[in-house]
């Protein structure tokens, strides 16, 4: 059975993944699967820079607005949904194109991946849950430095799960998850967009400015009024900072600056993940030849056996 070809476009936030994916999909008769852990949630539009129906240009998109913010959408769920979508898109004679910046989600589709769901130790988890974020992250850094580089200390839920897996298996979380063996069902081409760090950070700051102009504060306030502060989806950048403002613990300008700062740090972590975890064909973003270079790589890839 021949492997299904899949184009995968990755890179940091604000680098230009969406526009490139649309152009490739137009020319290659493709359908796009969002590889973004936040864009699956309805009501989180401005803060996630979610593509609009106009921007889709008639290209069919998948895994956008599929669940309410109160219902968690896990990496395991993304893995199963995406694998089914790849089969469906391919069976209709279309080219599957995955685009996004959530490395864990995208990687789970193409590599032998174990989420460590076989067992739990509720008592151990409760003990971890009673500890503060900094203490937990330092524990992870000591036990599994590789995972600590890729999981932010503010992501308490993910840090706890990593420590729990280490406790249950006796192995580092990073080793338990990925064995770096490609799934033999697919033939992926990983395209990564990169940009000069100063230019990328400038784009990120400008994007946040535009989000505020588009009504991010109102969008976040609606979610805040629905008492969703403790929902995992709301812990994403752009919402948690504004919730702090709504609670009177910061000014609006401080919240905005923190969103920009956290977004820049997130972009740096995204690049670290993709460079360390996946074999990517890197392309310089923001140039007149970006699309042409990407298209040439895709054509060569599709022509190969």
From Swiss-Prot:
* Catalyzed reaction equations: adenosine(37) in tRNA + dimethylallyl diphosphate = N(6)-dimethylallyladenosine(37) in tRNA + diphosphate
Supply the EC number(s): 2.5.1.75
Matching entries from Gene3D superfamilies are given as: 1.10.20.140, P-loop containing nucleotide triphosphate hydrolases
Q: Where is this site: Interaction with substrate tRNA?
A: 102, 125
Q: Identify the residues that bind ATP.
A: 11-18
User: Which keywords annotate this record?
Assistant: ATP-binding, Magnesium, Nucleotide-binding, Transferase, tRNA processing
Molecular function as annotated in GO: ATP binding; tRNA dimethylallyltransferase activity
| Residues annotated as binding substrate | 13-18
The cofactors it requires, by name, are:
Mg(2+)
The superkingdom of the source organism is Bacteria
One record GO biological process: tRNA modification
Give the region (Interaction with substrate tRNA) as residue ranges. Answer: 36-39
Q: Which family does it belong to?
A: Belongs to the IPP transferase family.
Looking up NCBIfam families in the UniProt record yields: miaA
Q: Which PANTHER family match?
A: TRNA DIMETHYLALLYLTRANSFERASE
Q: Write out the function statement from the record.
A: Catalyzes the transfer of a dimethylallyl group onto the adenine at position 37 in tRNAs that read codons beginning with uridine, leading to the formation of N6-(dimethylallyl)adenosine (i(6)A).
What is the protein's quaternary organization? Answer: Monomer.
What protein does this entry describe?
Answer: tRNA dimethylallyltransferase
């Amino acid at each position: 059975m021949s492997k299904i070809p899949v184009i995968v476009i990755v890179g940091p936030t604000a680098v230009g993944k969406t526009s490139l994916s649309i152009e490739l999909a137009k020319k290659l008769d493709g359908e796009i699967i969002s590889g973004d852990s936040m864009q699956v949630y309805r009501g989180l539009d401005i803060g996630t820079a979610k593509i609009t129906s106009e921007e889709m240009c008639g290209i069919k998109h998948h895994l956008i607005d599929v669940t309410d913010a109160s219902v968690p959408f896990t990496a395991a769920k993304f893995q199963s949904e995406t694998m089914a979508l790849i089969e469906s898109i391919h069976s209709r004679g279309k080219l599957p194109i995955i685009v996004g910046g959530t490395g864990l989600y995208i990687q789970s589709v193409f590599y032998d991946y174990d989420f460590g769901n076989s067992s739990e130790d509720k008592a151990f988890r409760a003990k971890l849950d009673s500890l503060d974020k900094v203490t937990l992250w330092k524990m992870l850094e000591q036990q599994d430095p590789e995972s600590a580089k890729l999981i932010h200390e503010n992501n308490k839920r993910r840090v706890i799960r990593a420590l729990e897996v280490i406790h249950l298996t006796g192995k580092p979380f990073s080793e338990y998850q990925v064995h770096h063996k490609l799934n033999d069902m697919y033939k992926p081409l990983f395209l990564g967009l990169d940009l000069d760090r100063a230019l990328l950070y400038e784009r990120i700051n400008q994007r946040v400015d535009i989000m505020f102009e588009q009504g991010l504060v109102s969008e976040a306030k609606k979610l805040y009024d629905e008492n969703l502060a403790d929902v995992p989806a709301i812990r994403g950048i752009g919402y948690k900072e504004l919730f702090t403002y709504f609670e009177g613990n910061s000014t609006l300008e401080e919240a905005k600056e923190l969103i920009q700062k956290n977004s820049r740090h997130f972009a740096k972590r995204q690049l670290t993940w993709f460079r360390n975890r996946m074999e990517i064909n890197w392309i310089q973003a923001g140039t007149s030849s970006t699309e042409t270079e990407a298209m040439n790589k895709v054509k060569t890839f599709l022509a190969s056996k």
